[in-house]
Amino acid sequence: MRRHSAQLIHHPAVLPWLGANFWSRTGGPLMWRDYDPKTVRAELRVLHEHGLTMTRSFFYWPDFHPQPDHVDETLCERFRDFLDAHTEIGMGTVPTFIVGHMSGENWDPAWRGGRDLYEDVWMVGRQAWFVSQMTRRFKDHPAVTGWLITNEMPGYGRIYQVDPPSSDVVTAWAQAMCNAVRAAGGTQPVSLGDGAWGIEVTGRDNGFSLRETAEYVDFVGPHVYRSDTDRPRQHLRAAFECELASVTGQPVVLEEFGLSTDTVSDRNAAVYYRQTLHNSLLGGATGWIAWNNTDYDDLWDRSPYDHHPFEMHFGITDSIGAPKAPLLELAAFAEVLKDVDFAHCRRADADAALVVPAFLERGYPYSRPADRPLIFTSLHQSYVATRAADLPVGFTGRPTDCPATPPCICCRPPASSPPAPGVSSSAAPARAPRSTSRSAPASTPGPAARGSTTWTGCSASNCSSPTVSPSPSRTTSWR
């Protein structure tokens, strides 16, 4: 069976994405108040010198959107300088719009007034307005290589994910946000920034469904920090979640991963990064964004670090900008990607499969939500066993979950609409009907690319076309 290995192709100069989530050491989440152009450039230079191609950046929502109908133009100019700093050294960045949750604390704009972020119509409108305003300002800057709607919205929209919204509600909200990007002229790939913590990956229904939102996004971005009592399970956890997150057939970017060096030695931090990077590569990830760029020792008396002090030391550089062990591992990984000509690689086909029980995400009669963690744990252990045996496997659903499917999207006639401006592409495939099968993609890229394609590759077992690459000169398979 063909295994998932879809890649983004829209911005070759900074692809594959290998980067860091970025807050400057001058302020953490409040960096835009304390913005120091010289320090930011020094921080970016260290990342670039170690092979990183991009960052993920953040519009701290209370500061950038201080009034319902007002954007802080001073902070926007500082952000533009931040973008210029990326361009100066050939890096890109993925701005994140709705940043109300960060590192163990939630922050609201003062005007929110307790309104629901998903179901209050006025509040949804204000979010969409902010997304469109920021997109219009920065969509044409060459440093912008993608967009994320939120940071970990499941933990912000409903704190602790208590009383989560329905999938219909979240999908409508996601549609409004992604459509705001497109209506404002943003052509770069977009995703939600939710962490891929929904039912297809975790078995927990928090309203965020990869299948249901696939129509509107261009890639999936797992956030993986989970620890385990067993070293092989821990080293393979991110890879396992990337495999599950590939259910839509879209590129999987490991959008957040890392660890605090308050809890581990430098040597073991390096081991964790090395294992996570290489295992997730073999698990189908095609982008990696570490958490995060620096330590924050000088911010010990500010929130969130005064109450979550371990959050100060997730950095891949220390608080004066010197590389830590994880950054050296990222640099070595960058060399591996270069040596294997990663843009022209795809995963080797597999002769074996792990069956993902439909009970993980379906509410069958006499099934209980409490059963799902056991399904997840058993499947995780099965995956670890196959990797220990050096047995390449694909993920699939039960045969009864996989009725005869129409030709996969790679095999369909291309759409006739012209490519969207600024997006590298061949013509887009028509959207396939949503499927419950893990053997075929649930959808094509989102409206990002109605008439354009921002990614390449297919995981469908019924695909009759070879994997498409931006340059067809060579395709290398890996296990």
Where are these regions (language model features)?
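Active-site mouth of glycoside hydrolases
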Residues: 2-217, 229, 288
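Catalytic-core region of carbohydrate-active enzymes that cleave or remodel glycosidic bonds
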Residues: 174-189, 212-298
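Glycine- and acidic-residue-enriched helix-capping/strand-helix junction motifs
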Residues: 361-383
